[in-house]
C-alpha cells in the first residue's frame, strides 16, 4: 500500500505534474497550468513543436523533452532518474488531459513505483466536455478512446459492447466516421448518438439524432475536423425480451476470457441484462 500526501510530504525527489492543455481554445488554459509549466524544471511534450507554440503564447521558457508513444519506452528511465534527483517535470499532451488517449500512463506508473509524487491538475478534457452537453445520460459512462481501424476488428468490438447500458464515448477520424456508424448500426441498432466536432473551436458542432439520421446528414454534409462519438447505452425494456435469445453464460465466459474474474464477470453480465445475479451464478456453475 502507498499513501501520497501531494503537498505535505517533503521529499528529496521531484514531482511529476500532469498538466492539461486547451483542446481548441487558448482561453481554457488555467492560471495554475501556466504557473506550473513555468515552475517545473522540464516539460515532457508529445509534440515539442505544437507545445512550443503554446509555451510561446503564455511566455513560458521552460525547456522541453520530447516524450511520445514511439520513444516512451526508452525515455521513461531517464525521466525517472531526473525525478529521483530532485527535478520536477510536467507532462503535457497535444490537447487535453495527459494519459487520456495520449501517452503518459506508463510514466505515471513508473513514477508511482519509484515512490515519486504524481499530481494531476484539473482542466480541459474533450470527453467530459462533450458528454455533459450531449443530452445523453452522463452517468454511468465509459470512454474507449480510438476505435479499431480494421472493419472486422471494429465489428467484433461493437458486438462485444452492444449490450452495455452505459453511455459510450469514442474518438474517430472524419474520414472513417461513416464506415464506423454503418458498422455500429449493424451491431447496436438505430439508437441515439451525438457526433461532436471542433470542440471549443469557432465551428463547434453537435449533431444529435439516431445513427441512421446522422448517416443521412453526413451524406449531404461532409464532416471536417476530429470528432467525438457519444452513443446511448442499450435500453432494457423487458428482462424476458432482452434475454430470450441471449446466451448469458457464454457472455460470462467471454468476460472471463478477456481477463475478468468469474464473480466479476457474472456481476457485469447480470447488471447489463438486468437479471438476478444469484440465478446467473447458479446457471454458470451448474455447467
UniProtKB/Swiss-Prot annotation:
GO terms for cellular component: cytoplasm. PROSITE patterns: RSMI. It is found in: Cytoplasm. It catalyses: cytidine(1402) in 16S rRNA + S-adenosyl-L-methionine = 2'-O-methylcytidine(1402) in 16S rRNA + S-adenosyl-L-homocysteine + H(+). It comes from the Bacteria. The keyword RNA-binding does not apply. Its EC number is 2.1.1.198. It is an enzyme of class 2 (transferase). Its main location: cytoplasm. Keywords: Cytoplasm, Methyltransferase, rRNA processing, S-adenosyl-L-methionine, Transferase. One of its GO terms (molecular function) is rRNA (cytosine-2'-O-)-methyltransferase activity. Transmembrane segments: none annotated. HAMAP family: 16SrRNA_methyltr_I (MF_01877). NCBIfam families: 16S rRNA (cytidine(1402)-2'-O)-methyltransferase. Catalyzes the 2'-O-methylation of the ribose of cytidine 1402 (C1402) in 16S rRNA. Belongs to the methyltransferase superfamily. RsmI family. This is Ribosomal RNA small subunit methyltransferase I.
